[in-house]
């Protein structure tokens, strides 16, 4: 667990060292930190970042093959975003699909921007924390976010019309910003307190 000088993380670190289960509290803290993340002058290659994140998520969860499909751009997509915000947004979308659904993530260039599209079939619809994260990412990058979802109850919730969510983000490229190296999938996979393990808690192996 990254502690730094945050008293909340120091407290959770002490609780974890004493054997307490801090995953639920750490999840709430990670989401709060992501939503409060300030603008950054450094860029993430969203194509590489998302590919690594989805690779780690696919290996971390107990799910059938094919529940997640990712199509990343072969070209870099540098966007000035805090890493913790992007990771939280992507993982919350993936979590929607984990109980019994499937997810599709695509990233492509488009007229000076990165275009990220998320689609998921979800028995529970879109969780309350997902849309604010996506909108915050769009706002920090100076972009746009469009999202929709079918109702959880009623006609669209039957077997022929399973509930779904969809979101599209258009995020301007930051081609002159310093580019951060993407994380390593193994670090996200094997660190018990990584965003993958914490934000997908309850579904990981």
What annotation goes with each model-predicted range?
Residues 42-59:
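Short beta-to-alpha transition helix within the HATPase_c
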Residues 102-114, 118:
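Short beta-strand/loop element within the Bergerat-fold HATPase_c
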Residues 69-77:
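Conserved catalytic submotifs in the C-terminal HATPase_c
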Residues 56, 82-105, 131-140:
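Conserved ATP-binding N-box helix of the HATPase_c
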Residues 2-13, 136-205:
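Flexible, glycine-/charge-rich segments associated with ATP-binding catalytic modules
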Residues 60-70:
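Short conserved segments within the C-terminal catalytic ATPase subdomain
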Residues 42, 75, 82, 86:
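Conserved ATP-binding motifs of the histidine kinase catalytic
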Residues 35-39, 78-81:
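Conserved micro-motifs of the catalytic ATP-binding
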